[in-house]
Amino acid sequence: SGEWLAVVSDRGGRPTVQLRRMSDGSVVPVPQLSRHQPHSSPSLSWNGRYLAAITQRGRRRLAVVTDRLNGRMHPLPLPGGRDPVQLSLAPDAQQIALQVTDQGRWRVELLDLSDLLEPDRPPGQSLSTPALSSEP
């Protein structure tokens, strides 16, 4: 929606994701990512509820999606020891495209996140809730 910008900046010698509010330039912390550095390839959902990024845990690179509403961080399992290189989160957070390396080859994989995350809908978009029946 243009309200948020996710950037990678050098903080203490490590690439770190920062979330900036565009209206005033303030930086909003993302505590879920603080233990898993360095960071790369940040991507935001429509309203900025979900922040996807690639993090490092030991020698392993992980693709994660952080839900800023409830504070949960969801690591995305990649089969066969593939390493994420870049990612792009769909605006509604229902899919993510991942560029991965697999035994020296580059691949792009599309993961369905609809069982993991609820949609991040644009402002004003109504939910498709069925009408209540007047009969018991």
Predicted regions and their residues:
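Multi-bladed beta-propeller domains
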Residues: 22-38, 55, 67-83, 113-136
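Blade-terminus and WD-like Trp-Asp/Gly-His loop motifs, strongest in beta-propeller folds
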Residues: 1-4, 41-50, 87-95, 132-135
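Conserved positions at the start
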Residues: 14, 38-41, 83-86
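Post-signal-peptide N-terminal segment of Sec-exported extracytoplasmic proteins
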Residues: 1-31, 36-37
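Glycine-centered loop/turn positions within well-structured domains
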Residues: 3, 15, 25, 49, ...
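Beta-strand C-termini and the immediately following turn/loop, strongest in propeller blades
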Residues: 7-12, 52-58, 97-103
